[in-house]
């Protein structure tokens, strides 16, 4: 029973920590701050661009790829937050610290790169690595400088770059596997 009691104490501490982060959001990261509205723009503008730019003839392929980017980027981001490697002082929704990046900016950017490489017979890996470098070495430092992203411990931008590379590789490979397995069923049933 001691193990379960210890587990309950850990969860209680985690709830207290979550409550503190929500209180921080109410005080400093609410809709009355300019940071909140920057994050809203980071969330909505890429989705609007995607709506107009996505190749509708490949919408499921590109959408599936984007979903993979979203899922794996979210996994890596949650891992980094939970391990204390980084965090987002300002958030659109307090329970989802990086929703603007995880669900919009990063997936949409990689989707548009993926679409462009498909439509122009270009090497996906080269352009995706360039985009990963832009995110890790240009966008993240900007977010740090304006206070929207914080790194802790020994984490640096190269580590973030490696995270982006992992996401872009896994997402591409899973999409490729599912695309190869796809066999359309044209029966009337």
What residues fall within each predicted segment?
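Aromatic-rich, lipid-facing transmembrane alpha helices and their immediate juxtamembrane interface loops
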Residues: 1-189
């Amino acid at each position: 029973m001691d193990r379960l009691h210890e587990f309950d104490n850990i969860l209680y501490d985690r709830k207290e920590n979550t409550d503190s982060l929500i209180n921080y959001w109410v005080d400093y990261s609410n809709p009355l701050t300019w940071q909140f509205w920057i994050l809203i723009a980071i969330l909505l503008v890429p989705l609007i661009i995607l709506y107009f730019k996505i190749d509708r003839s490949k919408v499921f392929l590109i959408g599936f790829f984007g979903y993979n980017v979203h899922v794996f980027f979210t996994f890596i981001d949650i891992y980094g937050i939970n391990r204390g490697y980084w965090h987002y002082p300002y958030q659109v929704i307090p329970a989802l610290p990086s929703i603007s990046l995880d669900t919009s900016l990063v997936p949409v950017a990689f989707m548009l790169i993926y679409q462009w490489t498909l439509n122009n017979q270009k090497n996906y890996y080269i352009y995706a690595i360039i985009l990963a470098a832009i995110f890790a070495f240009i966008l993240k430092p900007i977010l740090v400088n304006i206070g929207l992203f914080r790194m802790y411990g020994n984490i640096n931008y190269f580590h973030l770059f490696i995270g982006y590379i992992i996401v872009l590789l896994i997402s591409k490979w899973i999409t490729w596997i599912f695309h190869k397995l796809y066999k359309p069923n044209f029966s009337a049933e």
